[in-house]
Amino acid sequence: VSRGLGDVYKRQVYDYNMKFADAWQHEADQVSLFIFDEEGNYLKEMNISAEEARRNNILLDLQPGTYQILAWTGLNSDDYLCLAPADRTNSRIKDYSVRMNAEAQNVDRDLVPLFYGMQTVTIPDAATSDIRFPLMKDTNTFRLIIQADANNTSSSVPSDEFEFSITDNNALLAYNNTAVTEELPLTYSPYYLGDGDIHDPEGNVVLTTTCAELNTNRLIYGTHPRLTIRHKTTGKVWLNVDLIEYIMLMPTEGSLDKMLDREHPQQEYLDREDEYVIVFFFTQSSNGNMINVRITINGWTVRINNIEM
């Protein structure tokens, strides 16, 4: 790209993850930019294709001055709706938000990742500028697995026996990426539900596990999304817990020590982590009921009170 005097280039960076390393080239997608003046008055919108986003050298065509830049990815998909005034002439940055596209308040599909960024930038006179623009990933992936405990390997768990869901008030994210909790709650259901076989050294199937995968929008520390697992045959709710409290049960102290925001390390952790693998181990009681004896979250074991079903 030929650079001219006074040109301003924007470079996306996605290092707000648990590896603290830039993964934008792996995640790059279409980017929608909304540009406002220093007071937050709307100036213009730019839509950057995925190919251009991967090149990561976006010419902004801005005059010297101070601007507020708002960015989202994924707005070109069917998963999200950008809410903004039809006539943007007199609109302000606070008028912009993104809503999850949900039918009957239920989301049961593999979502296009939603990335968010907002930054105030000052462009100097007559100088070529490079703007480093950090992004945050709002979309989370949960893999929920139910399997027999090591001492109860004769038991199997067919996937059609369970219903999984996460309920949260995070359908609408404001311009500053906070959830508008006055909205109706969303129920996130699996986009994948299936069985997985575990084999012995000879290759024989020794047990079958249930695996569910689902996505959620951004998790906000201090809110109370619910993770629910229901047994279809009995109709009994096997698990109904505060999801964020469960996540924080694992030994996060070491991870929290790495966080840069010393005042809000829990929120930073939730924003950096975007994949959670939660395994529920069970044994069977003498009457044949399933008893949940322990769970692991991203490899960390959490002991819990027995939950019988």
Language-model segment annotations:
Residues 296-309:
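Short, low-complexity, Pro/Ser/Thr/Gly-rich segments in the mature regions of secreted, periplasmic
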Residues 41-138:
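Short, low-hydrophobicity acidic/polar segments
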Residues 13-26, 145-156:
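Structural motif
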Residues 1-9:
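Single conserved hydrophobic/aromatic residue that forms the stacking wall/gate
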Residues 29-83, 155-260, 309:
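Tryptophan-paired
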